[in-house]
Amino acid sequence: MKTSLLLVLVTGLSLVLTAGSCLQGKHVVGSKNYISQEVKADHFNEIKLLGSANISYHQDTRSHVEIHGSDNIIPLVETYVDGNTLMIKFKKNVSIWKGKLEIKVFAPELNKLSINGSGNIKLINGIQTSKDIEFHINGSGNIQGEGLNCRRMAVSINGSGDVRLQQIESQECQAGISGSGNINLKGKAIQAKYAIAGSGNIQAADLEAENTDASISGSGNCSCYASQKLVAREKGSGHI
């Protein structure tokens, strides 16, 4: 009887450990045998980064992706175009101890960049477009860059991520935070609109706008600029 009970306990423990291992996923350590690979990616004007990868965007005449990293890590990076969106992520249930990994995205024009997770996007040579641009973070990722010329720019954070954009030239700029993230903007705009719901901060005193509308519902703070008209609303402990 004792032997049977012990067997049941051991079997049960083995199943629990196996299940936990499956949930945790596979750990892959980079070989440090570095290679480069070019991935075909045609006809996209949006980037969606899922997970913890770090990528850089280069405005270029030809659309493609270049990946530089360990030869056993590169096959674990998934890049594909869904509609007009370039999707970038690691394979499911894989934990990457990546060491050096560079993912470079090239495209003539982008209208939206989004992060769902803890990854980072850096704009290397800015974005020049006559259309609108949208930046969105859901999680703890970061977006940074300089040299943005567009019709309308919208920045939103849901979580603890950060956005830092400089040398902005836009007719209209909107920025919103829901959470504890931070937005830092510098440049020029005709219209600016800021909204904070949470503890995050918007630093836009160096974004020279003619007309500015700012509202806070929470404990965050907003610094802003208006040369002609400022509308400010505070609901909570935050300050404008």
What do these predicted ranges mean?
Residues 1-240:
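Intrinsically disordered, low-complexity terminal regions
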